[in-house]
Amino acid sequence: MYAIITGASSGCGYEYARVMASNGYDLLIVSNEDIIHDKAALLRQEYPVTILSLVRNLGVQEAAKELYDYCHTNAIEVEVLINNAGVYHDRDFLEDTEAFNQLILNLHMYTPAMLMYYFGNDMVKRGKGYVLNMCSITADIAVQRLSTYGATKAFLQNFTRSVHVEWKNQGVYVTNVTPGAINTGLYNIRPWLTKMGLALGYIVEPDYLARRGVKAMLKGRAKVSIPGIWNTILLFLVALVPTGLLRLIRNWGIF
């Protein structure tokens, strides 16, 4: 049985691939970068499983159907779907181009939902399957310069929760992984804050997140928040902080 991991050429996606391979799953790893083939070669050296790699732009609406058709044509039976592909941005809404807005809406909402539709049908018919969706703590925080990013993650979070309830009695489990900050270089966080965040556990390494996420998924959990206590504290504090002060904190690059 195969696990599909999207956005698997680096960061959390690559670590998800390593964790799934260590659990004995064959892999289909997907990225919009050609380097995915090199990453597949590295994984083959480390794990005795079948590892396929595929270059696809998942930011277009036909991507989900194309990926499903590829699996059907090549007799790839998928038991695990990890929707990890995404983009991060730190800009005001009108600073983004029309093309970028279409990309982020497709990548964070349309493509994951349609991949779940196509592969979920097979999983439900088979009576077994797992889906992991990478959400974000920003789904619960409305702040400037993360307007589109946070809103798309809010859709994915709520969609994941709903479908988990719909499918869990049919042997298919959908897990919402909600991270805070991850040490992948995507975030515009000042170096001293990154160092402090890692020391305190507020910022986590991608391999740690991947292990926690997969463990929760295979247990059939609806959600795992990483790091849990810090996310809870942050959401509590954000609810208390005036909007003006929150804007200053964002401008300082604290989150």
PLM feature segments, named:
Residues 166-229:
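SDR active-site lid
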Residues 136:
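Residue(s) in the substrate-gating loop at a strand-loop-helix junction
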Residues 84-89:
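Conserved NAD(P)H cofactor-binding loop of Rossmann-fold oxidoreductase domains
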Residues 9-11:
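Conserved glycine-rich cofactor-binding loop
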Residues 92-94, 100-105:
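Substrate-binding pocket helix/loop in short-chain dehydrogenase/reductase
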Residues 116, 152:
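Active-site helix of classical SDR
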Residues 23-39:
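Conserved glycine-rich Rossmann-like NAD(P)H-binding loop of the short-chain dehydrogenase/reductase
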